[in-house]
Amino acid sequence: MSAHSGNVFMVVAPSGAGKSSLVRALLDRDPSIVLSISSTTRAPRPGEQDGRDYHFVTKEAFLAQREANNLLEWAEVHGNFYGTPRGRIDAATAAGQDVLLEIDWQGARQVKQRYPEAIGIFILPPSIEALQERLKARGQDSEQVISRRLLAAGGEIAHAPECEYVIINQEFSLALSELTQIISAARLRFSSQAVRNAELFAQLGIPASH
């Protein structure tokens, strides 16, 4: 993490593992975290709002953003494009704010290239059977789509070792507590504290790096 920069957190999970619910609950607890809102070409799900959950754009508009190099990362998932606009993240971290990205493993790899100290947090379901039940309970996808997501889940879960932390979302309140603890621990790292409390460190004669 460079001077005057905030932490970048990446929450990664297969579809149906509870990633979005955990992120929403975390932001309710800690509104100081800046949520990076991704652009996507997929249709909104029930209850989703443009500009809050995603920037819903056409395929043509998305590809134009990509060609203009305005995306920090992008990927094609289940036939739809997803991408992260770079401007807001760069501005937030430069101002010392922590940024959180809901992202897939492909995107997480690309973010790591830009922010090597970005912290990956992988959310796992307690079992494939539980994942299947959650996908069905959402009532948003056909059986064919659910089958496709389950097939993809195995490949996505194989990338869990690329993350620094893993949370098994068996019981929601416990998973949320663990996610909150990861955020807190990252903020207490020496590199973070040295930036956030630079004046105190200087008064105490503590070097800014070690």
Swiss-Prot record:
ATP binds at A13, P14, S15, G16, A17, G18, K19, S20. It is found in: Cytoplasm. GO terms for cellular component: cytosol. GO terms for molecular function: ATP binding; guanylate kinase activity. Residues 6-184 form the Guanylate kinase-like domain. InterPro entries: GK/Ca_channel_bsu (IPR008145), Guanylate_kin-like_dom (IPR008144), Guanylate_kinase (IPR017665), Guanylate_kinase_CS (IPR020590), P-loop_NTPase (IPR027417). Its EC number is 2.7.4.8. It is an enzyme of class 2 (transferase). It catalyses: GMP + ATP = GDP + ADP. It comes from the Bacteria. Its main location: cytoplasm. PANTHER family: GUANYLATE KINASE, GUANYLATE KINASE-RELATED. Belongs to the guanylate kinase family. Essential for recycling GMP and indirectly, cGMP. This is Guanylate kinase. It comes from Bordetella avium (strain 197N). The gene is gmk.
